[in-house]
Each structure stands twice: as structure tokens, then as C-alpha cells.
Regions:
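Flavin-dependent oxidoreductase catalytic cores
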Residues: 1-326
Length: 326
């Protein structure tokens, strides 16, 4: 399998896991890594939270050795605090520091962070320069096609980030106003790839091997990134890798495999967050895993009531009995 470099970091050219707040935590990342994700990015980390010593923020920075190559993603609107936070991230030894300039969530945008920075290119460039100046590793920037369909500026923005010292960029082919609706415009990613000399990661609507191959071919990007397409499907990374290598689809996972993965994932969440908090957070993951099963609406509602790991085991037994007719 081919590889490419972000700075001095070698990454296999299969598929990366996108940074997703409150989703791509350590347990989620480890599951995706086990199934072949070639590059992982953390949940977004508040630059000011890090600078002001917030313990919850600091916990987001903790890396397991098996997660590498790995990026910690910072967000913020103030170049000074972004630079200071990048310096603090050095103690966690990330392979890469990524800057979030693409998050569409109103709370983040309202503070001038995330995709709001696409409307403030000078501030965005200053942030990138400050992070590059303070980081001991390559710096990348993730952004969108633009703010809305009338202000598509990803190409100019990518050039600006390259000039500011970014070692790679990630472009999500949707605008901020689209959020996650409609289709991602892969042509924008292609244009970005043609405009800069640094590597370009493409993001948006990659959900399987066929769509991954199509994005590589249509955009010329150096790596594809999968976000929502991995919900309840960490094996999507294995599927992508196999398809890219052979041109063949792997068989659908069996119900037994799916339940075994869900069980392992929830056990990992509880390992890192404790059973009480872990099972609260596991509920949404379980709801994704049971999608498409017999009586999935009822099962998803049942997931919302999972309080203990024993509740989970009991639900899995019922699902297997129902699906397999035992």
C-alpha cells in the first residue's frame, strides 16, 4: 500500500478517522485503529481550556502509543492562546497538531472559532503561524469549502495556510451553512489539491471502499478521511483498505461479529471512563450498532436505557436470539 508524508510523519494511503467531538474519543479511535484507520485525529481541544488548566480539556490530550500516527486538534479564535496551547501540547508528544477551522456548530462559530475563521482569513493565517512557531511537530489545518455557496474560498484559504507554514490541509467539501446536509463537493477538494504543494486530505461522503476509491480518483487527494461513515461501523476502515488493494468488497459483517464489536467497544469506553459515565456515553454508539437490525427503532430506544455493562450483555443476548432465531 502506498504512503505519503505530512512533514516527517509517514501515513498509509488508506483512510483516516475524522475528528468528531463527543464521538471520536480514545475508545472509538482504538476501535477504528484496530480495523485499519491509518491516521487518527483527537476530539477538538479548547486552546483556552488548555491554557487555563482545565482538567477535562487536558484529558482529551492523552494518547495511547497504539494510536500513532496521531494528531491533537486545537480550536480557538485568538492567535496568542492558540500558540500558547500548541506549546503546551508538545508535552503530550503528538505526531501532528491539527487546527480546527471547519466546525459548523453554532456554539463554536459564535465564539469566532471553527468555520467562522473562513470569514477571517487574516486571523486564520496568524493563528496558523503562531501554532507552527510553537509546535514541535508538523501542523495541519482542517476547513470547509467556504462559509456558504456564495463565499466558496477553500482554494485561497488553502494557499494562505500553506504560506503560514501548514504541512498539510484537510478540506471538507461542504460549506458551513450546509452543516452535514446535501452532498460534499469533491471538485472543491480537487481544486485545493491543484493549488497547493502540501498534502491534501479529502473529507465528506466517504462511507465504503467504492466511495474512497472514487474520492482518490476524482480529487487526486493524498488521503481520504471518514467521519460519520464510521458510526457503528469501525470495520469500514478494513473494508476500504481491502477494496483499495483488491478492488473487491468484503462480505457484510455477521450479526455475531457486529455484537462482538459493540461489546468490545462499550467495554473500552467503561475502561477509560468508568461504568457509570461510560455506559451513558456508550448509548449513542449502541444505537448506531443496532441500526438495520430487526426492530431497530425499539432497540435504539432500549439503548437509551442502558445503565450498566450487564444491561448491555442482556440486550446483546436478546438481539442474537431474535436475529438468529435461537
Amino acid at each position: 500500500m502506498n504512503s505519503f508524508f505530512i512533514g516527517n510523519v509517514e501515513i498509509e494511503k488508506t483512510a483516516a478517522l475524522a475528528p468528531m467531538a463527543s464521538v471520536a474519543d480514545k475508545s472509538y479511535r482504538l476501535m477504528c485503529k484496530e480495523y485499519g484507520a491509518s491516521y487518527l485525529v483527537s476530539e477538538m481541544i479548547s486552546s483556552k481550556g488548555l491554557c487555563f488548566g482545565d482538567k477535562k480539556t487536558a484529558r482529551l490530550c492523552e494518547i495511547e502509543s497504539e494510536e500513532r500516527p496521531y494528531a491533537l486538534q486545537l480550536f480557538g479564535e485568538d492567535p496568542y492562546y492558540m500558540g500558547k496551547a500548541a506549546y503546551k501540547l508538545n508535552e503530550y508528544s503528538p505526531d501532528i497538531i491539527d487546527i480546527n477551522m471547519g466546525c459548523p456548530v453554532p456554539k463554536i462559530v459564535g465564539n469566532g472559532s471553527g468555520s467562522a475563521l473562513m470569514k477571517l482569513p487574516d486571523t486564520a493565517a496568524e493563528i496558523c503561524r503562531e501554532v507552527v512557531k510553537n509546535a514541535n511537530c508538523p501542523v495541519t489545518v482542517k476547513f470547509r469549502a467556504g462559509w456558504d455557496e456564495n463565499s466558496i474560498n477553500a482554494v485561497e484559504f488553502a494557499k494562505l495556510m500553506e504560506q503560514a507554514g501548514a504541512s498539510a490541509v484537510t478540506c471538507h467539501g461542504r460549506t458551513r451553512t450546509q452543516f452535514y446536509s446535501g452532498k460534499a463537493d469533491w471538485d472543491i477538494i480537487k481544486q485545493v489539491k491543484g493549488a497547493v504543494k502540501i498534502p491534501v486530505i479529502g473529507n465528506g461522503d466517504v462511507v465504503d471502499g467504492e466511495s474512497a476509491k472514487a474520492m482518490y480518483e476524482q480529487t487526486g487527494c493524498d488521503l481520504v478521511m471518514i467521519g460519520r461513515g464510521s458510526y457503528g461501523r469501525p470495520w469500514v476502515f478494513r473494508d476500504v483498505k481491502h477494496y483499495l488493494e483488491t478492488g473487491e468488497k468484503l462480505p457484510e459483517v455477521t450479526i455475531e461479529e457486529k455484537m462482538a464489536v459493540m461489546k468490545k467497544h462499550c467495554e473500552l469506553i467503561c475502561k477509560y471512563k468508568g461504568e457509570r459515565q461510560g455506559m451513558k456515553e456508550a448509548r449513542k454508539n449502541c444505537a448506531w450498532y443496532v441500526k438495520g437490525l430487526k426492530g431497530s427503532a425499539r432497540l435504539r430506544a432500549q439503548c437509551g436505557g442502558l445503565n450498566t455493562i450487564s444491561d448491555l450483555y442482556e440486550m446483546i443476548d436478546h438481539i442474537l436470539a431474535n436475529e438468529l432465531g435461537e
